[in-house]
């Protein structure tokens, strides 16, 4: 995930993102990609405890040096919270939210710069099974509504089943890379359009 998310450079091989060889980019270019093109969601929610859900969601625009005025920043943050069903919790602090709600705030924060790719590292690792389903359904809705490519790293087979493509890694090596035919069949049975190739979860 660190290589895919441009947090690390590969020590060998090549990684092309939108036609660019990531290993040839400098730190400023990599930082721009991380801030503008990729959103991150982690197992730990990484929310600031003394700030509201709304303020936590605004952070990418503040840290990214955006010149968006405060009113527009707030409007976008509210929209992101609404997209994950938390508009009514905007003024709540993390300790006033359940684990699932905190993860939804983290997802909303990851959406603030309208990324083309969302990287989710064990996003359900700290959640119970019911809440895990809710989070994965949010990812599915975002994929359908926004066309975002979502990459989910998980040890849970039932979570992986939400993906349209499943890569299995063992001991640092990809041992399988297959389309999720069961999920595609379910979509066709519901008369839904299949997810485009190359997207996950």
Indicate residue ranges for each PLM-predicted region.
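ABC family nucleotide-binding domain
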Residues: 1-163, 168-169
């Amino acid at each position: 995930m660190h290589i895919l998310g441009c947090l690390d450079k590969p020590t060998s091989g090549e990684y092309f993102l939108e036609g660019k060889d990531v290993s040839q980019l400098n730190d400023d270019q990599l930082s721009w990609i991380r801030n503008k093109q990729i959103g991150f969601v982690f197992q730990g929610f990484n929310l600031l405890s003394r700030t509201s859900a709304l303020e936590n969601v605004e952070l990418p625009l503040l840290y990214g040096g955006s010149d968006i005025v405060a009113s527009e920043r707030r409007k976008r943050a509210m929209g992101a919270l609404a997209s994950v069903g938390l508009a009514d919790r905007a003024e709540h602090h993390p300790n006033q939210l359940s684990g699932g709600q905190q993860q939804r705030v983290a997802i909303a924060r990851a959406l603030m710069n309208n990324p083309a790719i969302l990287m989710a590292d064990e996003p359900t690792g700290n959640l119970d099974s019911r809440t895990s389903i809710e989070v994965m359904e949010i990812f599915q809705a975002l994929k359908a509504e926004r066309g975002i490519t979502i990459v989910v790293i998980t040890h849970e087979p039932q979570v992986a089943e939400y993906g349209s493509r499943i890569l299995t890694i063992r001991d640092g090596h990809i041992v399988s890379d297959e389309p999720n035919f069961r999920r595609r069949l379910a979509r066709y049975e519901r008369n839904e359009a299949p997810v485009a190739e190359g997207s996950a979860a």
